[in-house]
């Protein structure tokens, strides 16, 4: 089905599939310190998932597909959260800009993202092609799974 895009299907499935694609192709170079770094100053620990960098890059790609261009500042705002201050009130806190910057640089090095003349980064034509191709694969897998199960028969 040629008309299927990323906007037409479940976003969690897109993010998971793109993360698997990024890891399998080997286009994305993960920085050395990303296995021990925290994703934000309001977090207590580093992520448990060893592939969190691929998932974060996939999420950034999906975000750039919908709303482009976006820079490091907007990415840190998206992944921000609540900083708990003990007995004091909680406040919003941005995510770590180092992780966002390294993710955007890795995507740019893989030629999935390119710099926008007005600032920030936008999805390149190669990145959009890959995301649409992955969306088509997800739809075909869902259709094949529906064909395998067949019609639902209710007996009395």
Curated annotation (Swiss-Prot):
GO terms for molecular function: RNA binding; structural constituent of ribosome. Keywords: Ribonucleoprotein, Ribosomal protein. SUPFAM superfamilies: Winged helix' DNA-binding domain (SSF46785). One of its GO terms (cellular component) is cytosolic small ribosomal subunit. SMART domains: Ribosomal_S19e. InterPro entries: Ribosomal_eS19, Ribosomal_eS19_CS, WH-like_DNA-bd_sf, WH_DNA-bd_sf. It comes from the Eukaryota. One of its GO terms (biological process) is ribosomal small subunit assembly. Belongs to the eukaryotic ribosomal protein eS19 family. PANTHER family: 40S RIBOSOMAL PROTEIN S19. This is Small ribosomal subunit protein eS19A. It comes from Drosophila melanogaster (Fruit fly). The lineage of its organism: Eukaryota, Metazoa, Ecdysozoa, Arthropoda, Hexapoda.
């Amino acid at each position: 089905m040629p008309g299927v895009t990323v906007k037409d299907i479940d976003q969690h499935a897109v993010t998971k599939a793109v993360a698997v694609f990024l890891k399998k192709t080997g286009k994305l170079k993960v920085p050395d310190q990303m296995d021990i770094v925290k994703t934000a100053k309001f977090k207590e620990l580093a992520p448990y998932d060893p592939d969190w960098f691929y998932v974060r890059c996939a999420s950034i790609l999906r975000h750039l597909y919908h709303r482009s261009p976006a820079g490091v500042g907007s990415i840190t705002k998206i992944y921000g959260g609540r900083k708990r201050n003990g007995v004091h009130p909680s406040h919003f806190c941005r995510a770590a800009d180092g992780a966002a910057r390294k993710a955007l640089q890795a995507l740019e090095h893989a030629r999935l993202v390119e710099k926008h003349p007005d600032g920030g980064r936008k999805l390149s034509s190669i990145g959009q092609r890959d995301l649409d191709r992955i969306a088509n694969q997800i739809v075909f897998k869902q259709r094949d799974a529906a064909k395998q199960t067949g019609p639902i028969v209710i007996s009395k």
